[in-house]
């Protein structure tokens, strides 16, 4: 891997992440890299500015923070095929990150320069909000196109998940969502909402809603109702090429809010719909571990060990 140009992105509210960012920049500059540092957080989004002002894209983006910082980076960098090296500094679970100890010494940069790493491709989703009237859809029923940039209120990307929930401040309401898969209405879900998750996001909100754990090597979409009020509304896993359309049902005040990776996107009115499908691009995640184990990660992060807590595993 070339390290001519590197972006170092650090979590905005973390002093340890800021200190590590300064150290990474110092080490990379000593190797001759052109380094740009920027902070990222819930109220700070550096990527539109970086992508608009930098003459050339970086060879690598080093992301220092937790999973939320990584998710924000992936949503903007994946479409440009920029590799992401994520390191947990100031984060919590850190499903998508390396341990902070990999930063000790400058061996990490030499490994990258010597191509001693692997690249994981993580599936992403795209949501497109269709605000056209029924008459406009009848005149132009073709599917909405996937743009190359997330540049407006109608197009959004997610590495973990999208979810839709009722949008009311004064009460805690339920909502009714009609789910259409590949042109066929399969359910009208009444409950707290609906999650559409990638395999990467299957260990997050979708898991809490009763969904399955999917290995990230699989491309598929998890469709998980949130607290449905019917036993027949169940989680399903659909192929990655499935086209899912979600329609809010009810009166005009039954608005629905769309969220991406835990960040609010936009609000849908009854009569509008949200189209979710696999994005054309994947997140490119740098993997430094020589023997990575997804199952070991799940066991350690979610304390998923079963009977291993009571007995030693066999050697078979």
Curated annotation (Swiss-Prot):
Cofactor(s) annotated in UniProt: a divalent metal cation
Active site (UniProt): 67
EC code: 2.7.1.23
Domain of life: Bacteria
Compartmental location: Cytoplasm
Keyword terms of this UniProt record: ATP-binding, Cytoplasm, Kinase, NAD, NADP, Nucleotide-binding, Transferase
Binding site for NAD(+): 67-68, 160-161, 190, 192
Pfam family, one: NAD_kinase_C
Main location: cytoplasm
A GO term from the CC aspect: cytoplasm
An example Gene Ontology molecular-function term: ATP binding
InterPro entries, per database record: ATP-NAD_kinase_N, ATP-NAD_kinase_PpnK-typ_C, NAD/diacylglycerol_kinase_sf, NADK
A GO biological process held by the record: NAD metabolic process
Reactions this protein catalyses: NAD(+) + ATP = ADP + NADP(+) + H(+)
Disordered: region residues: 132-151
NCBIfam families linked: PRK02645.1
Homology family: Belongs to the NAD kinase family.
Cited function: Involved in the regulation of the intracellular balance of NAD and NADP, and is a key enzyme in the biosynthesis of NADP. Catalyzes specifically the phosphorylation on 2'-hydroxyl of the adenosine moiety of NAD to yield NADP.
Name of this chain's protein: NAD kinase 1
Organism, scientific name: Parasynechococcus marenigrum (strain WH8102)
Gene name linked to the record: nadK1
């Amino acid at each position: 891997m070339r390290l001519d140009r590197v972006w170092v992105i650090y979590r905005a509210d973390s002093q340890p992440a800021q200190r590590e960012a300064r150290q990474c920049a110092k080490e990379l500059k000593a190797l001759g890299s052109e380094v740009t540092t920027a902070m990222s957080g819930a109220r700070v989004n550096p990527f539109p500015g970086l992508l608009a002002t930098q003459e050339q894209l970086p060879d690598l983006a080093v992301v220092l923070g937790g999973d939320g910082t990584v998710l924000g980076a992936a949503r903007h960098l994946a479409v440009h095929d920029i590799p992401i090296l994520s390191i947990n500094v100031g984060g919590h679970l850190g499903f998508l990150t390396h341990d902070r100890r990999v930063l000790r010494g400058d061996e990490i940069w030499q490994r990258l320069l010597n191509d001693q790493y692997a690249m994981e491709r993580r599936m992403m989703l795209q949501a497109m909000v269709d605000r056209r009237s029924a008459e406009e859809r009848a005149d132009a029923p073709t599917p909405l196109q996937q743009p190359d940039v997330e540049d407006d209120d109608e197009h959004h990307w997610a590495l973990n998940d999208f979810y839709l929930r009722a949008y009311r401040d004064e009460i805690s309401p339920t909502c009714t969502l009609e789910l259409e898969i590949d042109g066929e209405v399969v359910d009208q879900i009444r409950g707290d909402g609906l999650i559409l998750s990638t395999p990467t996001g299957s260990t997050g909100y979708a898991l809490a809603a009763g969904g399955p754990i999917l290995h990230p090597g699989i491309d598929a979409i998890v469709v998980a109702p949130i607290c449905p009020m019917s036993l027949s509304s169940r989680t399903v896993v659909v192929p990655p090429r499935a086209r899912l359309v979600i329609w809010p049902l009810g009166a005009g005040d039954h608005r629905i809010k769309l969220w991406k990776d835990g960040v609010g996107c936009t609000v849908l009115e009854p009569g509008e719909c949200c189209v979710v499908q696999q994005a054309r691009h994947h997140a490119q995640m740098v993997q430094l571990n020589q023997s990575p184990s997804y199952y070991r990660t799940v066991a350690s992060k979610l304390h998923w060990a079963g009977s291993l807590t009571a007995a030693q595993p066999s050697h078979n």
